[in-house]
Amino acid sequence: MDMYQNILVVIDPTTNEQKAFKRAIDLASRIQTAVPDMSVNITAFFSIFDFSYEMTTILSSGERDNMRQMVIDEKQQWLDDVISVNSLQVNNTSANMSQISITSEVVWHNRPYEAIINKIINDKYGLVIKGTHQHDKFKSVVFTPTDWHLLRKCPCPVLLVKEHDWPEQGNILAALNVGSDEAEHLSLNDKITKQAKNIAWLTNANVHLVNSYPGTPVNIAIEIPEFDASEYNSAMQAHHKEAMNKHAENFDIALSNTHVEEGLPEAVIEAVASKIDAELVILGTIGRTGISAALIGNTAEHVIDQLNCDVLALKPEGYISPMAAT
């Protein structure tokens, strides 16, 4: 089974409380418990940039380099202290740390997402974990440009961490597009479900599957009087339920844990996740049609904004980041 042995954690430089780092330690310790001989590497990482250092023309390039390095060194010391404190907090919860290696790095870069993705590509990370920001007065999440770029361009899975715990016997929700017979979607459905089962095995959780299907097109019902909207809707529902049942049986998932609902993907996913109190939603973020395509753009922002749990975003097999060639 797939395991995350090389994890990159995007550090939030605005706080000492690092929920993404703690999630990485928790996940790594669960991997250690499940597979004792497997080592897991965690890198705490973030980029910094101050344009004023680039505009100091009275200094030589060497002096500017030295000033930048002083800032990097200062942030590196802060990062190492934060890692030490957060690691100690996790150690106090009986995490298995025997074969978990923790390193850290601060780089100078004016585009955080580029620094992150370059690091992932160069050092072949299998997972990136990043915390989300919340409004001070509201529970909704601020969807940052870095989040958006990572979802679009990161070659490895992206885990966006919120505040929801991963309890024993919790629920993991896999968002699928079972209504499509395109090879890309079938492969992505399989990949999402396999990841859900892997993480459920590590966390002793239950896997649920969700799929949305479109309702009757209003314009057709108006323009074609003889069109039977009820029959159309029943046929659409039956098609998606049959496909969902087949997929669930292929992965030995109880049919009682499948959810096929009419509506927009963002509405259906949020409703089911809330209903089962999901600790994690796993979804695909690249695709031409259906649920995967709908999760690109504003819909992705809406889904992640509304969900009160972690989100793991996967790419299809064979995906190549547009930054890989740059």
What are these model-derived regions, one by one?
Residues 130-149, 280-306:
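Glycine-rich, Arg-bearing micro-motifs that act as flexible, cationic patches
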Residues 145-166:
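Short, structured interface segments
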Residues 206-253:
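Glycine-rich phosphate/pyrophosphate-binding loop and the adjoining helix
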Residues 1-3, 16, 26, 36, ...:
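Structural beta-alpha unit
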Residues 43-45, 101-107, 159, 208-210, ...:
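General small-molecule cofactor/ligand-binding pocket signal
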Residues 1-65, 171-226, 306, 316:
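Small/aliphatic-rich secondary-structure junction motif
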Residues 63-77, 228-239:
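A short acidic, glycine-rich active-site loop
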Residues 129-132, 157-163, 311-315:
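Short beta-strand elements of ligand-binding domains
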